């Protein structure tokens, strides 16, 4: 059996202590017939499990045919990237062609005869989102480790417009507290103040201890010492579990 723990940041490992409360809160809100929020911001210190939580939620919704899930790179032009990824979806691509939408100005497809090309990227996404709405689907966009960069600010401003248009777009972002704080302090992005923020606290001492004790079949005292070393950080839980597994024959 391969090591069930991982040293990779953000990758969901085989041995994983889930944050059931936060996961259910986001999933139930997004899946609601009339969602009270279409954005969640997950924050916490490095190693607190932000990316793993976001990935877990994204993977859950990927299994639902009524959802489209797209991950964006925060260091690139997010609007352009989102449009390109939506256009690359076979179901959506055919819908755009049937609706005679010409996105060739952005390198998306070819010119459509007797159709005026759309020349504004925000307008491109509005038209795409309208087609997603007509298909009965919802779109989840995930962005990991956001910073108050120009690309992020522009994307957040456009997202605010999409919300006012009642578009079926949802946003899940992770970031260090100071970056989230700086982003929401932008005068044009004050709506982010109202966006729910989940601050990931350390894992429960008893959850970590019990997990180690049961998985490694060790006594409570040994499991407790291991738990103390993790300080409740999910990544530390992974690292210690990984090392214990690799050296289990020595114990």
Question: Could you describe each region identified by the protein language model?
Answer:
Residues 1-40:
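A short, basic N-terminal segment
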Residues 195-223, 229:
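Conserved small helical "lid"/interfacial subdomain of P-loop NTPases
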Residues 37-41, 68-69, 138-140, 170:
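Residue-level preference for the first positions of well-ordered beta-strands
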Residues 217-251:
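Amphipathic alpha-helical "lid/sensor" segments that cap RecA-like P-loop NTPase cores
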Residues 77-108:
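Conserved NTP-binding/hydrolysis module of P-loop NTPases
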Residues 114-178, 185-186:
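Conserved Walker B catalytic segment
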Residues 41, 55, 59-77:
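Conserved catalytic segments around the Walker B and adjacent sensor/switch elements
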Residues 36-56:
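Walker A/P-loop nucleotide-binding motif
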């Amino acid at each position: 059996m391969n090591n069930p723990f991982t040293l990779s940041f953000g990758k969901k490992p085989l041995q994983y202590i889930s944050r059931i409360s936060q996961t259910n809160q986001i999933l139930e809100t997004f899946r609601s017939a009339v969602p009270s929020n279409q954005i969640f911001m997950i924050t916490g210190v490095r190693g607190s499990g932000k990316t793993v939580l976001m990935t877990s939620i994204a993977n859950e919704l990927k299994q639902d045919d009524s959802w489209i899930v797209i991950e964006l790179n925060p260091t690139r032009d997010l609007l352009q990237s989102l449009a390109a990824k939506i256009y690359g979806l076979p179901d959506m691509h055919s819908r755009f062609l049937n609706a005679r939408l010409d996105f060739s100005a952005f390198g998306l497809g070819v010119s459509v005869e007797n159709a005026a090309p759309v020349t504004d990227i925000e307008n491109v996404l509005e038209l795409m989102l309208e087609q997603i709405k007509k298909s009965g689907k919802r779109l989840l966009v995930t962005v990991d480790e956001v910073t108050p960069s120009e690309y992020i600010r522009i994307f957040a401003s456009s997202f605010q417009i999409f919300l006012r248009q009642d578009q079926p777009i949802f946003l899940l972002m992770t970031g260090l507290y100071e970056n989230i704080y700086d982003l929401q302090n932008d005068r044009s992005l004050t709506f982010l103040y109202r966006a729910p923020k989940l601050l990931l606290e350390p894992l429960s001492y008893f959850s970590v201890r019990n997990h180690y004790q049961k998985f490694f079949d060790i006594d409570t005292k040994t499991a407790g010492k291991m738990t103390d070393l993790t300080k409740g950080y999910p990544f530390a839980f992974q690292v210690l579990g990984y090392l214990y597994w690799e050296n289990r024959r020595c114990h």
